[in-house]
UniProtKB/Swiss-Prot annotation:
Protein name from the UniProt record: Membrane protein insertase YidC
Keyword set, alphabetical order: Cell inner membrane, Cell membrane, Chaperone, Membrane, Protein transport, Transmembrane, Transmembrane helix, Transport
Membrane topology listed for this record: Multi-pass membrane protein
Physiological role: Required for the insertion and/or proper folding and/or complex formation of integral membrane proteins into the membrane. Involved in integration of membrane proteins that insert both dependently and independently of the Sec translocase complex, as well as at least some lipoproteins. Aids folding of multispanning membrane proteins.
Upper taxonomic lineage: Bacteria, Pseudomonadati, Pseudomonadota, Betaproteobacteria, Burkholderiales
Amino acid sequence: MDIKRTVLWVIFFMSAVMLFDNWQRDHGRPSMFFPSATPTKTVGSAAPGTTTPGTQPADLPATNAAAPGNAPAATQSQLVKFNTDVYSGEIDTRGGTLSKLSLVNKGDGKQPDLVITLFDRTANHTYLARTGLLGGDFPNHNDIYTPLPNQQHDLTGDEKSFQLSFESPVKGGVKVIKTYTFTRGSYVIGVDTKIQNVGTAPVTPSVYMELVRDDQPVETPRFSHTFIGPAVYTDQHHFQKMTFGDIDKNKQDYATSADNGWIAMVQHYFASAWIPQQGVKRDIYVEKIDPALYRVGVKEPVPTIAPGQTVDVSARLFAGPEEERMLEGIAPGLELVKDYGWVTIIAKPLFWLLEKIHSYVGNWGWSIVLLTLLIKAVFFPLSAASYKSMARMKAITPRMQALRERFKGDPQKMNSALMELYKTEKVNPFGGCLPVVIQIPVFISLYWVLLSSVEMRGAPWILWIHDLSQQDPFFILPVLMAVSMFLQTKLNPTPPDPVQAKMMMFMPIAFSVMFFFFPAGLVLYYVVNNVLSIAQQYYITRMMGQTKAKAA
């Protein structure tokens, strides 16, 4: 029995260590076990003019990420403010760049009125979306655009949408009119680039669309951090994400050209993504442009524009929460920015089920409780077999100890006697291991579901729990977790080895300290799971005792 219990605890402990190691690697930190493999430099064949990972495209204009207030007076731009039912933001006339974007009604549980600022450009933080032209001395994100007159800046009344347009200076015989379309209830912004040839010679420019941000971490509770960095999606190579550390080491790996897909910047709970027109060939680039500034973008060639002609290039810009159902309806594969890693195949059905439960009960905390009940019901046959095996082992523990005492000088005879005892009593010393092994993928999957789901952010449960994505403010759930683990230890047979017995008593304390910093929603799951496990084990053990008494 002591061997089996050791195996169970080692499996549980290693699963927790693997979770922490996965968290480390998602943050660009080295793995505790495996060195980072050097990835292939490119994925697939790069078309002429594409970039290789880590190489700056030669024709991209130099960046200008300084905050407007730090710019020289002669080149000072202005900020055009706008408001919708989901956004408040600013467009910088330098480049017609979307330099600030806040998501209203996305505050946390402590400060419900606090909006989340996704895009921003200050002295301490840079994150923005911008576009421009390549292929000549054409308008780009460094030029000062002029807002068109008599424009609406706010979504009012019953209006479904409004537009803001900006006109560039004429450069290289080309003028650009950039138009942003904001729609009620939508986190997708239409971006139309109208390219007018006002010169005397044909021009063949390319349009670039990029997301620029620094490597500042997102503020989230300890043990609750997830991936931050650029990502690329194409139909051929699917979802490819890169840490800022990968880019620093020139180890980023992504498709460099495609005629489909999107590029994104991903962070905990929120993401932004450029979604160009599908079926149009484009090059993709990911690079470091300043000591702590990175960009991911696409370059889309434009057909030759004759003098007097105009060409429109349309794209969509997503900036919002990582809500799976919404993302699925915006673009193929966009829901993958909510990244579950290697447990996606289990995590996605779990989230679907959690979402279905929530649609009926209307509370994410109670949804977690009910999901835990369902999971325990599904695994009940396996759990019952495990608890029955443990009960049989507990019943023969005195005889096992007697055999160990009798043959303590002869390990071979002791093992032989123990095997004979197991055979006589029809006990499998490892009978309780299988249910634990099978449930580990579910354990890890639900961890990532609860950690990654923006729906938990600001979601209350009862009484003192006002935000399931934050740690328990009074540590009540972690204490209950410690108590439940201690009770489970008491229900199981005591290991004959005193050192091992002390280790079994210490493990609940060690795990509970770690859970002090986990999100309340995650700890809630484990508390409910432990309570149900105790109830199951007590019931099955009692039933076995009654059956044995009747048989006697």
